[in-house]
Amino acid sequence: MTGIGEQSIAEQVRSLLEPVLERDGYELVEVEWARLAGRWTLRVFIDKAGGVGIDDCQAVSKTVEPILDVADFIEPAYDLEVSSPGLDRPLRKPRDFDRYAGQRVHVKAYGPVAGTAPGSPARKHWTGVLKGFRDGAVELDVDGALHRVPHDQIAKANLEYDVEGDLRRKD
């Protein structure tokens, strides 16, 4: 199809692939459609219990490539990349916020959000320890204060890998 926007292609790919990947035991974490170094690239980020390895990425690539070819809704030639979401995994669904409770996260809102914690000013960014998802809001501990950020106000949320903490645990 001509004239499909970048976001629309990612949404269509998600709708097409999510049920297939779930059937095979994978979670479709994110889909990116972007022009990189002059070429279109479709990135599919997957996860599963226990983590994702190179064999998983190859298997998913072999599964989804023919599905995308048959659907044939992406007009320009593109490269397909399948990978794990990485150490800074995005968090989107309510279950993501419960699954990673106890981990350090960074949350960014679409705009300033007031009243996320008693006496706190309106803010757009939070970094703290994720407590979970309750009553339509993400809860996180920021320097000892519990903040509740409405899920529909979150533009982006990611795990934050603590390199220093990991190194301390290895000593």
Curated annotation (Swiss-Prot):
It holds the Pfam family DUF150_C. CDD domains: YlxS_C. GO terms for cellular component: cytosol. It is found in: Cytoplasm. One of its GO terms (biological process) is ribosomal small subunit assembly. Keywords: Cytoplasm, Ribosome biogenesis. Required for maturation of 30S ribosomal subunits. Belongs to the RimP family. This is Ribosome maturation factor RimP. It comes from Anaeromyxobacter dehalogenans (strain 2CP-C). The lineage of its organism: Bacteria, Pseudomonadati, Myxococcota, Myxococcia, Myxococcales. The gene is rimP.
